[in-house]
Amino acid sequence: MEIQQRKILVTCALPYANGPIHLGHMLEHVQADIWVRFQRLRGHNIHFICADDAHGTPIMLKAQEMGIKPTDMIADIRASHESDFSGFNISFDNYHSTHSEENQALSSQIYIALRENGYITNRTISQLFDPEKKMFLPDRFVKGTCPDCKADDQYGDNCDACGATYSPTEMINPKSAVSGSTPIMKDTEHFFFDLPQFEDMLKVWTKSGALQTEMANKVGEWFETGLKQWDITRDAPYFGFEIPDAPGKFFYVWLDAPIGYMGSFKNLCDKTEGLNFDDYWKKDSAAELYHFIGKDIVNFHSLFWPAVLEGAGFRKPTAVNVHGYVTVNGAKMSKSKGTFIKASTYLDNLDPECLRYYYAAKLTSRIDDLDLNLEDFTQRVNSDVVNKLVNLASRTAGFITKKYDGQLSNHVSEPQLYQSFIDAGTSIAALFEQRDFARAIREIMALADIANKYIDEKAPWALAKQEGSEVKVQEICSMGINLFRVLMTYLKPIIPKLAARSEDFLAETLDWEIIKKPLAGHRINKFKALFQRIDPKHVEAMVDASKDSLEADKAAKQKQAAAQLDAAKSELDKEPLAPEIDFDTFAKTDLRVALITKAEAVPKANKLLKLTLDLGGETRTVFAGIKSAYTPEELEGRLTVMVANLAPRQMKFGLSEGMVLATGPGGKEIHILNPDDGAKPGQRIM
């Protein structure tokens, strides 16, 4: 069946041009790149763009500190960013900068359209002002004592120690992070985007499928608290674009940053014959537009950005695909504190294809955080890519090149087995489309297991010792090569360099449609090592090279732990510990890991969800009072913890066969327990 060609534009969030790319950034760019490469492999017309977010007070001040012009600094940063993305095989069609002629023209055009359509207001506000530097201070350039937990040296918008958010004017003893002086309040006139005018449109759009269910629910909470006008102004001195007809006033970076998607695409159109900007951005465009972003900037992309596009007469995104954060060995990464492994540090020590594969193996369409467990990383890549995939080719290619001059058998000896691998492509393609790369890899590796089992059972190395077995050995090894070819095609979007080396070995381009016909009578090239096993010493070297930044996090972690300890004491005051029990009493409780295979609302029940739990071979039904905190869609496919030996209890709505464990005071603040990566349904919790 011929696939209808789609016109697609894909963007990644724009990295800020004041520091290096780290492995947290790289998750998003790898995720988007895999999806883009898959669409290209399927024959669609797709364009993949990005740019540096190059404006704002932090860039202006850092350039001053370095004694260079902001334009020189952002040019150097852009070069390093492009080098890192290239190193990780991110296949952008265009990488640009928000500090560009295209972006300035589009920002002014959109602002004027919003103003003429009645969506811009102005009013006088009071802000903190540094009297020494004679500049208004953004929240992150005010530091002081947290008004909630009293932790010192916190930023003016949120506390790293306790997580509280607040206004800089609420801080205790605020100081300018620029000069150290005590800021004063000063009036200034600012322009505002009237977001509340778009509430009805946004309520429809956010529920249209443009957002993941979790994000749509989160946006629903913001509607409940009420939308507010957005300040789109910054006062001089500021590095950015001056607002038309407003000398000394500049666009806040969050206005011209998302417009940078359009600016980068406009730059691509201007240098690409036949590529028309309006075909992708005009209001009635039939093209698809996808933004890949992190969950920290959902507010901007789910409310502000679609409203700006609507108000200025442009199309809205088809979907905003949100991912979680990256942790390393369970520890939070923090860009502001410098506690990250830089992309360049990784590239100095390890193959980027390894991280691409590992990220893909853990990426789903949900917004869960992803932990880069370095021990698991080593084991997973070596087991899957080396032992299962590459080994399939290496153990069969030798016979073909040595005994048959590289020529494959003239026919496929196991046509049904080959067809089963081709048929699996339908579900694998659907999983790629849905961005559920983890499940796609599980299906591909299950096929790899079948292929290796086939070779193990046929044992061509033993058969080759028997007289008159030449044809049979050639058929078996040719089958192994053909199955490798199918597997490598499915993995081509994830590990493109390995795919390219495999194409050289197979003397054929890996193509989703072409593999439907097996290779017969085809000559392959001599097998060369396709992939290097991860050496744990190289992982250690990468960690050692990042030690300076990782060590810097220890003091912050200790401070955060102290704040969490204080918070824990507060929780104990609310609900004291239960009376002590002995071990034998505790051991009577059988806690098990359970997979939530199905979750559904219970008619006429305000608090209950009906959960179907898989205990690794046994299925249980449990009614849980967590409806106020979770939708069924958020729960399906997740692991949780249940009391497995609790006596069944007949309820009004059915029989409940256990209990899932959760914490929190109730309402939206209920949190079910999730086992760590590697836990399996049915495992007992000790």
From Swiss-Prot:
Q: Which SUPFAM superfamilies does the record cross-reference, listed alphabetically?
A: Anticodon-binding domain of a subclass of class I aminoacyl-tRNA synthetases, Methionyl-tRNA synthetase (MetRS), Zn-domain, Nucleic acid-binding proteins, Nucleotidylyl transferase
Q: Position of motif 'KMSKS' region?
A: 332-336
Motif 'HIGH' region boundaries: 15-25
The reactions it catalyses are: tRNA(Met) + L-methionine + ATP = L-methionyl-tRNA(Met) + AMP + diphosphate
Q: What GO cellular-component annotations does this UniProt entry give?
A: cytosol
Q: Which residues form the signal peptide?
A: none
UniProt keywords (A-Z) are: Aminoacyl-tRNA synthetase, ATP-binding, Cytoplasm, Ligase, Metal-binding, Nucleotide-binding, Protein biosynthesis, RNA-binding, tRNA-binding, Zinc
| Domain tRNA-binding, residue spans | 585-686
> Pfam families annotated for this entry?
Anticodon_3, tRNA-synt_1g, tRNA_bind
Superkingdom in the source lineage: Bacteria
| EC annotation from Swiss-Prot or TrEMBL | 6.1.1.10
Chain sites annotated for binding Zn(2+): 146, 149, 159, 162
Choose any GO biological process term that the UniProt entry carries and state it.
Answer: methionyl-tRNA aminoacylation
Q: Which family does it belong to?
A: Belongs to the class-I aminoacyl-tRNA synthetase family. MetG type 1 subfamily.
Instruction: Please explain the role this protein plays, according to its UniProt record.
Output: Is required not only for elongation of protein synthesis but also for the initiation of all mRNA translation through initiator tRNA(fMet) aminoacylation.
Could you describe the subunit structure of this protein? Homodimer.
Among NCBIfam families, the record links this protein to: metG (TIGR00398), metG_C_term (TIGR00399), PRK00133.1 (NF001100)
Which PANTHER family is this protein grouped with? METHIONINE--TRNA LIGASE, METHIONINE--TRNA LIGASE, CYTOPLASMIC
Identification of the protein by name:
Methionine--tRNA ligase
Species whose genome carries this gene: Psychromonas ingrahamii (strain DSM 17664 / CCUG 51855 / 37)
